[in-house]
Protein backbone atom coordinates (compact mmCIF):
# COMPACT_ATOMS: atom_id res chain seq x y z
CA UNK A 1 0.00 0.00 0.00
CA UNK A 2 1.00 3.59 -0.57
CA UNK A 3 -0.47 6.18 1.75
CA UNK A 4 0.04 9.59 3.29
CA UNK A 5 -1.01 11.24 6.54
CA UNK A 6 -3.53 14.00 7.16
CA UNK A 7 -0.76 16.13 8.64
CA UNK A 8 1.25 15.89 5.43
CA UNK A 9 -1.81 16.55 3.26
CA UNK A 10 -2.47 19.80 5.16
CA UNK A 11 0.94 21.07 4.00
CA UNK A 12 0.05 20.62 0.34
CA UNK A 13 -1.03 23.53 -1.82
CA UNK A 14 -2.32 21.63 -4.84
CA UNK A 15 -3.02 18.26 -6.40
CA UNK A 16 0.42 18.12 -8.02
CA UNK A 17 2.10 18.21 -4.61
CA UNK A 18 -0.10 15.32 -3.44
CA UNK A 19 0.82 13.46 -6.61
CA UNK A 20 4.50 14.18 -5.92
CA UNK A 21 4.32 12.62 -2.46
CA UNK A 22 2.43 9.60 -3.80
CA UNK A 23 4.85 9.17 -6.71
CA UNK A 24 7.79 9.41 -4.28
CA UNK A 25 6.27 6.53 -2.30
CA UNK A 26 5.55 4.57 -5.49
CA UNK A 27 9.23 5.11 -6.34
CA UNK A 28 10.19 3.31 -3.12
CA UNK A 29 7.97 0.38 -4.11
CA UNK A 30 9.15 0.29 -7.74
CA UNK A 31 12.80 0.29 -6.66
CA UNK A 32 12.12 -2.39 -4.00
CA UNK A 33 13.65 -0.22 -1.28
CA UNK A 34 12.03 -2.01 1.66
CA UNK A 35 13.41 -5.38 0.62
CA UNK A 36 16.84 -3.98 -0.16
CA UNK A 37 16.98 -2.01 3.10
CA UNK A 38 16.12 -5.14 5.08
CA UNK A 39 18.82 -7.17 3.30
CA UNK A 40 21.39 -4.41 3.79
CA UNK A 41 20.48 -4.01 7.45
CA UNK A 42 20.86 -7.74 8.05
CA UNK A 43 24.23 -7.81 6.30
CA UNK A 44 25.47 -4.75 8.18
CA UNK A 45 24.26 -6.14 11.51
CA UNK A 46 26.11 -9.41 10.87
CA UNK A 47 29.21 -7.47 9.85
CA UNK A 48 29.04 -5.34 13.00
CA UNK A 49 28.50 -8.39 15.21
CA UNK A 50 31.44 -10.16 13.57
CA UNK A 51 33.61 -7.11 14.21
CA UNK A 52 32.52 -6.97 17.84
CA UNK A 53 33.18 -10.69 18.33
CA UNK A 54 36.55 -10.46 16.60
CA UNK A 55 37.63 -7.52 18.77
CA UNK A 56 36.54 -9.48 21.86
CA UNK A 57 38.56 -12.51 20.78
CA UNK A 58 41.67 -10.53 19.85
CA UNK A 59 41.60 -7.93 22.63
CA UNK A 60 39.67 -9.75 25.35
CA UNK A 61 37.60 -7.94 27.93
CA UNK A 62 39.83 -4.87 27.83
CA UNK A 63 38.61 -1.31 27.55
CA UNK A 64 40.00 -1.14 24.01
CA UNK A 65 38.22 -4.38 23.07
CA UNK A 66 34.91 -3.07 24.40
CA UNK A 67 35.35 0.26 22.63
CA UNK A 68 36.20 -1.36 19.29
CA UNK A 69 33.30 -3.79 19.67
CA UNK A 70 30.85 -0.92 20.21
CA UNK A 71 32.40 0.98 17.30
CA UNK A 72 31.89 -2.02 15.00
CA UNK A 73 28.21 -2.26 15.95
CA UNK A 74 27.64 1.49 15.57
CA UNK A 75 29.53 1.55 12.28
CA UNK A 76 27.18 -1.07 10.87
CA UNK A 77 24.22 1.13 11.82
CA UNK A 78 25.78 4.15 10.07
CA UNK A 79 26.19 2.10 6.89
CA UNK A 80 22.46 1.35 6.96
CA UNK A 81 21.61 5.05 7.45
CA UNK A 82 23.68 5.96 4.41
CA UNK A 83 21.80 3.35 2.38
CA UNK A 84 18.47 4.83 3.53
CA UNK A 85 19.53 8.33 2.42
CA UNK A 86 20.45 7.08 -1.04
CA UNK A 87 17.04 5.39 -1.30
CA UNK A 88 15.29 8.66 -0.41
CA UNK A 89 17.27 10.47 -3.09
CA UNK A 90 16.33 7.81 -5.65
CA UNK A 91 12.64 7.99 -4.63
CA UNK A 92 12.75 11.79 -5.05
CA UNK A 93 14.23 11.36 -8.55
CA UNK A 94 11.59 8.78 -9.50
CA UNK A 95 8.84 10.98 -8.06
CA UNK A 96 9.91 13.97 -10.16
CA UNK A 97 10.09 11.83 -13.30
CA UNK A 98 6.71 10.19 -12.65
CA UNK A 99 5.13 13.61 -11.98
CA UNK A 100 6.33 14.87 -15.33
CA UNK A 101 5.23 11.72 -17.15
CA UNK A 102 1.74 12.07 -15.63
CA UNK A 103 1.54 15.67 -16.90
CA UNK A 104 1.90 17.32 -13.50
CA UNK A 105 4.31 20.17 -12.83
CA UNK A 106 7.50 18.37 -11.73
CA UNK A 107 8.44 21.41 -9.59
CA UNK A 108 5.66 20.29 -7.22
CA UNK A 109 8.08 17.80 -5.65
CA UNK A 110 10.42 20.64 -4.74
CA UNK A 111 7.64 22.83 -3.33
CA UNK A 112 6.13 20.08 -1.17
CA UNK A 113 9.59 19.14 0.14
CA UNK A 114 10.13 22.81 0.99
CA UNK A 115 6.82 22.93 2.89
CA UNK A 116 7.74 19.74 4.73
CA UNK A 117 11.18 21.12 5.65
CA UNK A 118 9.65 24.35 7.00
CA UNK A 119 7.09 22.41 9.04
CA UNK A 120 9.77 20.08 10.44
CA UNK A 121 11.88 23.07 11.48
CA UNK A 122 8.87 24.71 13.13
CA UNK A 123 7.98 21.49 14.98
CA UNK A 124 11.56 21.19 16.23
CA UNK A 125 11.54 24.80 17.41
CA UNK A 126 8.21 24.40 19.22
CA UNK A 127 9.48 21.26 20.94
CA UNK A 128 12.69 22.97 22.01
CA UNK A 129 14.87 20.83 19.76
CA UNK A 130 17.57 22.21 17.53
CA UNK A 131 16.96 20.00 14.50
CA UNK A 132 19.43 21.98 12.39
CA UNK A 133 22.38 20.54 14.32
CA UNK A 134 21.61 16.92 13.42
CA UNK A 135 24.39 15.89 11.02
CA UNK A 136 23.25 14.30 7.77
CA UNK A 137 25.23 11.11 8.44
CA UNK A 138 23.04 10.49 11.51
CA UNK A 139 19.77 10.75 9.60
CA UNK A 140 17.73 8.37 7.44
CA UNK A 141 16.86 11.24 5.07
CA UNK A 142 19.10 13.65 3.15
CA UNK A 143 19.43 17.26 4.26
CA UNK A 144 16.04 18.96 3.60
CA UNK A 145 17.57 21.97 1.82
CA UNK A 146 19.54 19.65 -0.46
CA UNK A 147 16.40 17.65 -1.28
CA UNK A 148 14.51 20.83 -2.23
CA UNK A 149 17.39 22.06 -4.39
CA UNK A 150 17.97 18.66 -6.02
CA UNK A 151 14.27 18.19 -6.81
CA UNK A 152 14.12 21.65 -8.41
CA UNK A 153 17.23 20.89 -10.47
CA UNK A 154 15.79 17.56 -11.64
CA UNK A 155 12.47 19.21 -12.56
CA UNK A 156 14.05 21.99 -14.59
CA UNK A 157 13.28 21.50 -18.25
CA UNK A 158 10.95 18.54 -17.78
CA UNK A 159 7.50 18.74 -19.36
CA UNK A 160 4.37 19.00 -17.26
CA UNK A 161 2.52 22.06 -16.04
CA UNK A 162 -0.67 20.84 -14.38
CA UNK A 163 -1.17 21.77 -10.73
CA UNK A 164 -4.82 20.75 -10.42
CA UNK A 165 -6.78 18.62 -12.86
CA UNK A 166 -10.24 19.91 -11.93
Where are these regions (language model features)?
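Membrane-active amphipathic alpha-helices enriched in small hydrophobic residues
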Residues: 43-61, 67-79
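Catalytic Zn2+-binding segment of zinc metalloproteases
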Residues: 16, 26-43
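Soluble periplasmic/extracytoplasmic beta-strand elements of cell-envelope proteins
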Residues: 1-7, 19-22, 30, 114, ...
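Short pre-active-site segment immediately N-terminal to the catalytic Zn-binding motif
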Residues: 3-20, 81-86
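Extracytoplasmic and endomembrane cell-envelope/extracellular-matrix remodeling and assembly machinery
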Residues: 79, 84-166
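Acidic/histidine metal-binding catalytic segments
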Residues: 38-47, 64-68, 103-113
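Secretory-pathway/luminal and periplasmic proteins that interact with or process carbohydrate-rich
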Residues: 29-30, 56-62, 118-126
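Short alpha-helical scaffolding segments that buttress acidic/His motifs in well-ordered protein cores
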Residues: 22, 71, 75-76, 112-116
